Swiss-Prot record:
Function per UniProt: Hydrolyzes benzylpenicillin and cloxacillin (at 10% of the rate of benzylpenicillin).
Additional information: The class A beta-lactamase family has a specific amino-acid numbering system, sometimes called Ambler or ABL numbering and often misspelt as Amber. A multiple sequence alignment was used to derive a consensus sequence and then the consensus was numbered taking into account insertions and deletions. This allows use of identical numbers, e.g. for active site residues, despite differences in protein length. UniProt always uses natural numbering of residues, hence there appear to be differences in numbering between this entry and some papers.
Highest rank taxon of the organism: Bacteria
Signal peptide location: 1-36
Similarity section: Belongs to the class-A beta-lactamase family.
MF GO annotations: beta-lactamase activity
Residues binding substrate, per UniProt: K252, S253, G254
Positions of the catalytic residues: S86
Keywords: Antibiotic resistance, Hydrolase, NADP, Signal
The enzyme's E.C. designation: 3.5.2.6
Modifications after synthesis and translation: Predicted to be exported by the Tat system. The position of the signal peptide cleavage has not been experimentally proven.
InterPro entries: Beta-lactam/transpept-like, Beta-lactam_cat, Beta-lactam_class-A, Beta-lactam_class-A_AS, TAT_signal
The protein's name in its UniProt record: Beta-lactamase
Amino acid sequence: MRKPTSSLTRRSVLGAGLGLGGALALGSTTASAASAGTTPSENPAAVRRLRALEREHQARIGVFALNLATGASLLHRAHELFPMCSVFKTLAAAAVLRDLDHDGSQLARVIRYTEADVTKSGHAPVTKDHIDTGMTIRDLCDATIRYSDNCAANLLLRELGGPTAVTRFCRSLGDPVTRLDRWEPELNSGEPDRRTDTTSPYAIARTYQRLVLGNALNRPDRALLTDWLLRNTTTLTTFRTGLPKGWTVADKSGGGDTYGTRNEAAIAWTPDGAPVLLTALTHKPSLPTAPGDTPLIIKLATVLSEAVAPA
């Protein structure tokens, strides 16, 4: 839904109910074209840029971008599988909101954990400071999405019944592809040809769309999840820097220390309020010691935004 204002803020996005009715209607009108896929001939310049980046970075790149206001789209390896990494954390928090917090009381429940939980998670910027007191489920969700805290994510998975609960959650949303099998940090291993802990650019983009712009969650839970994504801290100097100024972004990143895995899944709004799906998944199957390629993700943000929402 296009809004009359010239720019959007986090408050206006949330206060307007995320543009749900218009965005979803626009999504339905463009769904047939997007699901059919964009062939290279439909956007040859953008596809050439993606292929050049694959050669330059020795990476396999999968993208799905869709402007829900205009129908402009860009797909490249959009239905191929890629390691998911921390992009799953949005799904875990959403599953907690829908399946555990039926009456609103569970978010205030305190979860206790140990120093061993923190240590084995490999990345615990928030949970490491609350071992003595524990953390509420609400704060664990916040830490999971906004700081990509692995320990917090594992604790949410434990409450849900394990990683496969995320797979079941995705299936309930109509996503037949996305799956989670392991815990943090093992799920980030990124071995080539492994189907576990994977998604495709198209599948994860559509699932994020259902959660943020659709009716997969009730309105209060949808607003809460979107607020966490809007205030995400892990992409402020990465994916978001490659987008045009004035865009409002709700997103989650992911990555690993092997096979060059670096991912991004986002819902963005242009300054005039057009909702845009942006997903970029990257993987370097031939480079087992390669860290995640942040410069590549920044470049992909620019390619995707210019392809589907040119200035």
